[in-house]
Amino acid sequence: MVKQGKLGSVSSKLTLYVGILIVLILSITSAVAYFGSKENSFRLLKESQFKLMDDTLKTFNIYTGFKRNAMTVLASQIGHLDHLDEDEIYELLEMTLKTAEFGEVFFASEQNAKTYLSNRTSLSLTQLNFKTRPWYEKTKQEGKLIATEPYKNATDGKTVITYTVPVIHNGTFVGIVGGDLNLAAVSDQILMMGRTAESYSQAISPNGDILFHEEEEKILSKTTLSENIANAIKANPHLLDDDNDETLFYVKGNDGKAQAIMCDLTFNPYFRICTITAESSYSKASNKILFQQVITGLVAIIVALILVRILIARNL
């Protein structure tokens, strides 16, 4: 009986010591695996968010690049007309309106002080004094295409940006062509490309104005999130640098919860394309990995202890 008691005591001690060793080994390996998986999960989520931002940015640049090119072509075509014939001007305006899908296309003529519209009407200088408009003065002065900041069109109340290009005829400046891009009309097309189960995209101005939204009345409005994003970039402009790898930053959202943000510039510096992911998406992925590691570790420890107990008992 004494011998059996001693053997049982030795067996228990060996099981305890080996068990502690196994727990330590499995704990260390599980911790290493957890932190490795957590880092990998964070990297994948970050890469996914970056790709979403990049895809949205490319879509925006391609879409607006087509509009800019259409205005440049129109300016060249009008500049090559022999006598700046009104019928030919209207035809070119109509064609550009249809092919480039602008809300309105116009030609502001320096020679006769008239603004020709794509609906085949014209405005006199008393109806529209384009010469006093900032976009006209800036385009004439710089001699190149410009894009205005978003503004509400006085004629229909739509929020637009206007692309303008100087028209040169026989070496002489004769006016400016312009096209109005309705932001509400393109919001769905741009935002559709920037949405996943975890993230969505937004275009935000340097002042925190929302520039794209499915609901037209919310364009040019501000939210807590949009203002916080704008303020974070003002405080650290390097967040927009292409060569900055640490472009992910966090701000409070409209609900007070942390949001993971990435932003980049477009051709138009007034537009910043940002992707937004709830910070909880990153923490949920980490928590899921931790839970899996804990369950796996506990099962492995229990199985190992049982096997050790059996092996020790058989050999004593």
Regions found by a protein language model. Name each.
Residues 47-146:
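Extracytoplasmic/periplasmic sensory segments of membrane signal-transduction proteins
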Residues 15-16, 33-63, 85, 282, ...:
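Juxtamembrane interface helices immediately C-terminal to a transmembrane segment
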Residues 98-99, 116-193, 197-200, 252:
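Extracytoplasmic/periplasmic ligand-binding sensor regions of membrane-associated signaling proteins
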Residues 175-176, 213, 272:
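Short glycine-/small-residue motifs
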Residues 3-39, 43, 294-306:
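Extreme N-terminal signal-anchor transmembrane helix of membrane signaling/transducer proteins, especially
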Residues 91-92, 119-151, 216-250:
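Extracytoplasmic/periplasmic sensor domains and loops in membrane signaling proteins
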Residues 225-293:
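Extracellular/periplasmic juxtamembrane segments that couple receptor/chemosensory ectodomains to their
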Residues 105-112, 200-210:
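Short hydrophobic alpha-helical segments used for membrane anchoring or interfacial signaling
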